[in-house]
Every structure is written in structure tokens, then in C-alpha cells.
Amino acid sequence: MQKTELDDQKLVEEIARRIREILELLGENPEREGLKETPERVAKALLEMTSGLRTPPPQIKVFSLGEDGEVYEKNQIVLIKDVNFSSLCEHHMLPIIGKIHVAYIVSNSGKVAGFSKIIRIVNYYSSRLQIQERLVEQIADAIMNSEIKPKGVMVIGNAIHMCSYVRGVKDKEAKLVSVAYRGLFKTNRALQNHVFRLLDNANKVNLL
């Protein structure tokens, strides 16, 4: 978490002032009707999209399987698929838009994470200037080092990058897929393939 001495309103004012300067350098008139409020809107949008830099990481809510006396399957794999995310590419500050899939192997203690907490972790690490390869690594580390202490974590990212969509090569179809492995997933190809099959089968039967 990065520290700043400026409060939110002051941050908006300072960023907006610089956006006005950029508009002028681009040959625009920031005082014309359509642009009068643009600097402040852009400032607020940038602060929202980078909020993960200035807020503490979310805590994972832990639940325990078997606490009701029921027997649970050992080495159970939990899969959270199709977590929508958006981030800003750190090279061009243009959007990255896609989906994250998270799989983890439940520890012998039977601890599992609250569903929404995994989504919050994805959102937290997405909310900053980012590259997709690092994003999946950070999500994997956060879950692997959490209180649920999984035996393994696998995080898959699949996204469109606007830096290649609207500029440069202007490829409208290309997507980037990145995968991070931790624990048992790191060396066990069968477990990796099992997760890919789960995702493939879920897509075939339109499981949402």
C-alpha cells in the first residue's frame, strides 16, 4: 500500500490540473463545453482504477469443512471461474479487460475461503497499474499465503489489452493468457490438466 499525504479531494484537484495541461498540449481547449468537467472526471476515474495502491489488502473470511461433523473429500479442488476484472496496463495506461479463474486445493484442516473474498482479492490487485503476468502471480501468492493455507493454487488470466486493440498493431482478436502455479499445482501436471478440463467442461454445458 502506497502512502500519500494528500486527501482524496486534494488528489482529485492535483490530478485534474495536470489533465488540463495534457489536454492543452494535445491541442484541445479544456474550457470548451464538452471538456469543462473532463479533467475532474478523469482524475476520479484514475483514482478509482488505482485504489489498490492506497488501500490495505482484503482479509479472507475462513470457513471450515467438516465442522458440522460431516466427512469431506480430501484434496478437494475449489474452482472460482469467470471473475470479471479490469485493470490499467502500466506501459500505456490503457485498459486490460478479461476474466480470472482461481483454483485451490483444500488443506487437510479443511479451511476454505469465502467466495466473495476471492473476488475482492482479484479486484484489489487489478486496481493499479499492472501487467497481466504479475497480476496472476500476486493473486496466487495472496491466496497461497492466506489463513486457508491451501496445498496449491492455480490462477489463470485471459484478457484483451487495449494497448494492442486501439493502437500499434490494432489487433481486435488477440488475447493474453497467463497462468501462475503454487504448491502442488507447480509440479503436478495431472492437477493442472484437471483444472483445465473443469473449465472446459463447465463452458461446454454453459455453467455460469
Swiss-Prot record:
One GO cellular component, as annotated: cytoplasm
EC number(s) reported in the record: 3.5.4.16
A biological process from GO: tetrahydrobiopterin biosynthetic process
Pathway(s) this gene product operates in, as recorded in its UniProt entry: Cofactor biosynthesis; 7,8-dihydroneopterin triphosphate biosynthesis; 7,8-dihydroneopterin triphosphate from GTP: step 1/1
Catalyzed reactions: GTP + H2O = 7,8-dihydroneopterin 3'-triphosphate + formate + H(+)
UniProt keywords, alphabetically: GTP-binding, Hydrolase, Metal-binding, Nucleotide-binding, One-carbon metabolism, Zinc
Recorded family membership: Belongs to the GTP cyclohydrolase I family.
Binding partners and assembly: Homomer.
Protein name: GTP cyclohydrolase 1
Organism annotation: Saccharolobus islandicus (strain L.S.2.15 / Lassen #1)
Gene: folE
